[in-house]
Amino acid sequence: MLKTFASLVPRLCRINGLSATLLTVASMMICGGDIAEAQLPTIGSIERIDSRLDLIVSSDAEMEVLAAGHEWTEGPVWVPALEGVLYSDIPNNAIYLWREGGPASLWLQPSGYTGETPRGGESGSNGLLLDHEGGLLLAQHGDRRIARLDSSWDAPVASFETLVREFEGKRFNSPNDLAVNANGDLYFTDPPYGLEQGIEDPVKELDVHGVYRLTADGSLTQVISDLPRPNGIAFSPDQGTLYVSNSGLPPVIMAYDVTSSGDLSNGRAFYQSWGDGLAIDQQGNVYVAGPDNGVLIISPAGELLGSLNTTQRTSNCAFGDDGYTLYITSDMHLLRIRLNVKGVGF
């Protein structure tokens, strides 16, 4: 369920750079799983470090608040069939849908944990992705697997097909985020954030927090095994480079060459920063959610151009609409900003 207004006000009052009308959004009545519509407020600011950012983000660009009142949002994905964006609310084990002009509405629950035994922690879906057939793939924390939704878009039910749930006979920790390449191979990260007791959880089976490749024919390979907390993952426009954010120590955004066979080589530090979810535009700029309460924008050469300062913890971002809109999951909110460059895949 969504937080009550009384529980939100103290947190909102501590947030700087938030337009006053956001209090209206936070106090919206919750009826039938819908967040009542309100005039869109704005939040945060744009920090410009390099003049090249002006070609990406216009001087009058603003981050709009599309939805509020969630527990912790993650995994935005644009779905053409719905003409909207889906995103996870992990602690509430739910996926929400936002479409232009309407309120955000509960779209699927449960989304990441389908067990009968009640559990706490981050049990829901995290990263969401469309495969090449247009199906919805989910990194499910609670069920500890990568799954495909086996349901219609217009009347979704919590029916899932398991794509993979273990490596060499041992259950995954809690798959977090995922990316797919042109031939349909799926790459995903597996940190322990979805385990109720983290690395000390007695149900933990794998010693490694790995990155994996699931090929279109169903074979599974561990392609990275030396990152403490692999998190966000995304391909460069030519798919010759795979970026992976490490949210453990030392915090770093890694880059890997992708061989013709799909293996990884030449792992190197791309940018020294903590990071969560990643997105890439068609010019190869890398958008890193998480550090310093916002989204860093980094050139293909690893130079910081600026940031989208949301003023709060930020988990992920993804391009949508016509490709020029960046959707951002930030704490209890879903945000968007219009850019001058398109995201990869548009």
Task: Give the ranges of each region predicted by the language model.
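N-terminal secretory signal peptides that target proteins for export/translocation
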Residues: 1-15
